[in-house]
A protein has these predicted regions:
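Short beta-strand elements that form the blades of beta-propeller/WD-repeat-like
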Residues: 13, 83-105, 136-169, 196-211, ...
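Active-site-adjacent structural elements in enzyme catalytic domains
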Residues: 40-45, 153
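Surface-exposed loop/turn elements that mediate protein-protein interactions on large endomembrane-trafficking
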Residues: 48-76, 101-128, 159-190, 210-230, ...
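A short, structured loop/turn motif at beta-sheet edges
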Residues: 5-13, 43-46, 285-289
Length: 304
């Protein structure tokens, strides 16, 4: 059991206990589950009082008996219905993330492959199972190869004990993962999830990533780092659904900008939208690859 203090405020504390359990299934074997229990406790002169209790339970995918007769992947019990998954254009290779591990399912061979995981096959998983990282599926090619991003605490491997961002490429034919870039970060995981990687994209040998309101590009061959955009404040920019384009206020002002610049990261091209002299523009979002923006007369804007 791994205890963790989530927060402490005066006489109230929130604690989390994380552990694993096993349970028999219908196939004469057992399944493994990760359990997180949250306790909200108050301390008084007379003792401790439990104010609230919550429990989450998630099944650990192991690729055994997890493919149904209708070719659906059975992920079992999960506390969320959201699944981090993506497929190639032909729908042959499906990548998905489960409990900190990246898996690939090939519909042509009807096989599962564990692409990336900190967990070992024959360990107690205490060190490897520390859950403080995210996996983002970046790109899947028609031959099954994939590019993905691991951000957070590195449980094992070359960067064990460090917090950072690792850009990796997986070769399906060779069943091999190659790290193309590692960016160490001197911040804890909970801060990293808020300030790093909100925008990330790979185009050929160029990698884009947003860190602390600045969009950087990295040449994956020469490792040269370039600053593309600065001052990307919340609500001052929008990213396309595919993640390959970003539209942002050139001035960085949410309610007073006369120019919006749209950067297409897939081909490194850009164009600008200009407002009339007495008007202002604001990026609102994307519908697929179509950029949506708002326009208003400056004299009609009243800031409270």
């Amino acid at each position: 059991i791994m205890p963790e203090v989530i927060s402490v405020d005066d006489d109230v504390a929130i604690l989390r206990l994380s552990y694993r359990v096993g349970a028999a299934n219908d196939y004469s074997s057992s399944d493994t589950y990760t359990v997180s229990e949250y306790y909200r406790i108050r301390q008084t002169n007379s003792g401790f009082y439990l104010l609230n209790f919550e429990r989450e339970m998630n099944q650990v995918f192991d690729a055994r008996n997890d493919l149904t007769s209708t070719a659906k992947i059975n992920l079992g019990i999960n506390s969320s219905t959201d699944v981090n998954c993506a497929s190639d254009e032909k729908g042959i290779y499906t990548y998905f993330v489960n409990q900190g591990s990246l898996w690939c399912f090939s519909s042509s061979s009807q096989t599962f492959t564990r692409v990336f995981s900190f967990k070992g096959e024959e360990t107690d998983s205490v060190r490897e199972g520390y859950d403080a990282h995210n996996i983002k599926i970046m790109k899947i090619e028609d031959n099954g190869d994939a590019t993905f991003l691991v951000s957070g605490y590195m449980n094992r491997g070359e960067h064990e004990g460090q917090v950072g961002v690792s850009l990796c490429r997986y070769s399906y034919s060779d069943n091999d993962v190659t790290e193309r870039l590692f960016i160490p970060m001197a911040i804890p995981y909970n801060i990293l999830t808020q300030n790093v990687g909100g925008v990330s994209y790979v185009s050929n040998d160029k990698f884009y990533i947003l860190i602390d309101e600045t969009l950087y590009s990295v040449d994956l061959v020469s490792k040269e780092v370039m600053t593309e955009i600065t001052g990307l404040k919340e609500n001052s920019y929008a990213v396309s659904d595919a993640g390959d384009a970003i539209a942002y206020s050139v001035s960085g002002d949410i309610c007073n900008t006369d120019t919006i610049r749209v950067l297409n990261m897939s081909n490194d091209s850009a164009y600008e939208l200009k407002a009339d002299e007495a008007d202002t523009l604001r990026p609102l979002g994307y519908i697929d690859s179509d950029f949506i923006y708002g326009m208003a007369h400056k004299e009609d804007i009243c800031l409270l």
